[in-house]
């Protein structure tokens, strides 16, 4: 009798949900204190004036104003908030 053992189940077939990272408020947009401007892993974008950085590297506004992105030294991108 020809027999065959049961085939193993696939080890693939799962995927984690996206983490919803990235820029949340773009240049020129008006923000209020506490608004998250960028969600990121590590410092892809650095904090400039009138913004804070959380322990997960999220950048948020500390004043009301407009978002400004700027290139700094050694190709670093900074985000600031220009008060109204």
UniProtKB/Swiss-Prot annotation:
Pfam families in the record: Ribosomal_L27
Keywords: Ribonucleoprotein, Ribosomal protein
Matches recorded under Gene3D superfamilies: 2.40.50.100
Aminoacyl-tRNA synthetase found in the keyword field: no
A GO MF label: structural constituent of ribosome
GO terms (BP aspect): translation
GO cellular component: ribonucleoprotein complex; ribosome
Keyword tRNA-binding: no
Region of interest: Disordered: 1-21
Family, per entry: Belongs to the bacterial ribosomal protein bL27 family.
HAMAP family: Ribosomal_bL27
Protein name: Large ribosomal subunit protein bL27
Provenance organism: Pelagibacter ubique (strain HTCC1062)
């Amino acid at each position: 009798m020809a027999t065959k053992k049961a085939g193993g189940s696939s080890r693939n077939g799962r995927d984690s949900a996206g983490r919803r990272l990235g820029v949340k408020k773009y240049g020129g947009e008006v923000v209020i204190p506490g608004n998250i401007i960028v969600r990121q892993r590590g410092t892809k974008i650095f904090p400039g004036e009138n913004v804070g950085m959380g322990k997960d590297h999220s950048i948020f506004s500390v004043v009301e104003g407009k978002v400004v992105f700027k290139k700094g030294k050694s190709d670093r991108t900074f985000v600031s908030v220009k008060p109204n």
